[in-house]
């Protein structure tokens, strides 16, 4: 008997094991709306758990989606007691990192204008690293490491599941490559510090700090993340696309890359569907023409990903902004949209100011 895969995310929304959920795809396909919707549905379905939604996209949209301001520190969504949001700000994170480096350098005996502390006082670290390609992804990765450390120590708010609203595909792939890249880099650093450790400690003004120990601790943290990201019970990736050629092509490329990283991926959200055959009241030649094109690519998606959860989401008449609109829209992730029965809901969003 053939395995029937449900066209919804019900199993993920009610999952008791997942710690990390990534939501990504091509730019402009509705990633933020989808990640917010997943987070809301999980929070509603599991009220005894705490959820965190993090934006790793430099063009942060979580504040716009919910209609309230979020920043670099996690803050509860108004109207929900078990869902928090945060937007990683690279410039603020770099400043914090620079200030921390100054403090540590001064504590370890590198005071003075000629020491490491003096070099960093003017924001040299932030200035140097701010222009490095991929710094946004690296800072996002550091945030993941911080959450793992805090949970291991029992510090701060404990989140059962973290949902990532990721940047467009290229940024996301660089982010997911970081565990492997850092692991290899730290191995090389380990070899160097094994030979030059005392000299490096002296240069850093950190005679009482064993650099090799610090590197080994960092390597252990990176390996922990690698293990968790490749465990399908703990981590999964939800692809988001629209039913057009370029989006379908990029989704396939993304899926192949994720498979090469040994990451679990078995869900696709297809957004902005017209379902024109079932909407005779609001129909036109242009709608029919676009729906015909969408159906062509939907058939290809169904054929290519027959063993995936393919969730088909409607194009709404208005913007999906604010908690109430997101709640209405997100219900179709848990129980698939029925054009004949649910048609009215997509027009209810039209009147939201």
Swiss-Prot record:
Highest taxon listed in the record's lineage: Eukaryota
Intracellular or extracellular location(s): Cytoplasm; Endoplasmic reticulum; Golgi apparatus
Keywords: ATP-binding, Cytoplasm, Endoplasmic reticulum, Golgi apparatus, Hydrolase, Metal-binding, Nucleotide-binding, Transport, Zinc
GO function terms (MF aspect): ATP binding; ATP hydrolysis activity; metal ion binding
Catalytic residues as annotated in Swiss-Prot or TrEMBL: 57
EC number: 3.6.-.-
Main location, first listed in the record: cytoplasm
Binding annotation for Zn(2+): 284, 287
First-tier enzyme category under EC: hydrolase
Any Gene Ontology CC annotation: GET complex
Gene3D superfamilies, per the entry: P-loop containing nucleotide triphosphate hydrolases
InterPro entries xrefs: Anion-transp_ATPase-like_dom, ATPase_ArsA/GET3, ATPase_ArsA/GET3_euk, P-loop_NTPase
Residues reported in the UniProt entry to bind ATP: 26-33, 244, 271
GO biological process, one term: tail-anchored membrane protein insertion into ER membrane
Similarity section: Belongs to the arsA ATPase family.
Subunit structure, interactors included: Homodimer. Component of the Golgi to ER traffic (GET) complex, which is composed of GET1, GET2 and GET3. Within the complex, GET1 and GET2 form a heterotetramer which is stabilized by phosphatidylinositol binding and which binds to the GET3 homodimer. Interacts with the chloride channel protein GEF1.
Role, per record: ATPase required for the post-translational delivery of tail-anchored (TA) proteins to the endoplasmic reticulum. Recognizes and selectively binds the transmembrane domain of TA proteins in the cytosol. This complex then targets to the endoplasmic reticulum by membrane-bound receptors GET1 and GET2, where the tail-anchored protein is released for insertion. This process is regulated by ATP binding and hydrolysis. ATP binding drives the homodimer towards the closed dimer state, facilitating recognition of newly synthesized TA membrane proteins. ATP hydrolysis is required for insertion.
HAMAP family (alphabetical): Asna1_Get3
Protein name, as recorded: ATPase GET3
């Amino acid at each position: 008997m053939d395995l029937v895969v449900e066209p919804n995310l019900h199993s993920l929304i009610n999952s008791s094991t997942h710690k990390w959920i990534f939501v990504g795809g091509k730019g402009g396909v509705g990633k933020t709306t989808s990640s917010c919707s997943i987070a809301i549905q999980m929070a509603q379905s599991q009220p005894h758990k705490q959820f965190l939604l993090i934006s790793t996209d430099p063009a942060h949209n979580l504040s716009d989606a919910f209609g309230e301001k979020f920043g670099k520190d996690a803050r509860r969504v108004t109207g929900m007691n078990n869902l928090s949001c945060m937007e990683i700000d690279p410039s603020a994170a770099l400043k914090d990192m620079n200030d921390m480096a100054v403090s540590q350098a001064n504590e370890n005996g590198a005071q003075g204008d000629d020491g490491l502390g003096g070099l960093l006082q003017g924001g040299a670290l932030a200035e140097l690293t701010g222009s490095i390609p991929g710094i946004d992804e690296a800072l996002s990765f550091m945030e993941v490491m911080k959450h793992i450390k805090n949970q291991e120590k029992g510090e701060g708010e404990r989140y059962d599941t973290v949902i990532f609203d990721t940047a467009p595909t290229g940024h996301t792939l660089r982010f997911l490559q970081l565990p492997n890249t850092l692991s290899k880099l730290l191995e090389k650093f380990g070899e160097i510090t094994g030979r030059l450790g005392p000299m490096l400690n002296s240069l850093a003004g950190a005679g009482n700090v064993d650099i090799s120990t610090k590197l080994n601790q960092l390597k252990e943290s990176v390996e922990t993340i690698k293990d968790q990201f490749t465990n399908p019970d703990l981590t999964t990736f939800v692809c988001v696309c629209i039913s057009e050629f370029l989006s379908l092509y990029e989704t396939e490329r993304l899926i192949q890359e994720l498979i090469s990283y040994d990451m679990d991926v078995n869900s696709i959200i297809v957004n902005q569907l017209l379902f024109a055959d079932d909407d005779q009241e609001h129909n036109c030649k242009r709608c029919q023409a676009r729906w015909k094109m969408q159906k062509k690519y939907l058939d290809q998606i169904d054929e290519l990903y027959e063993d995936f959860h393919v969730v088909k989401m409607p194009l709404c008449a208005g913007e999906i902004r604010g908690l109430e609109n997101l709640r209405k829209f997100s219900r179709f992730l848990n129980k698939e949209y029925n054009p004949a029965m649910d048609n009215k809901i997509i027009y209810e969003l039209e009147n939201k100011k």
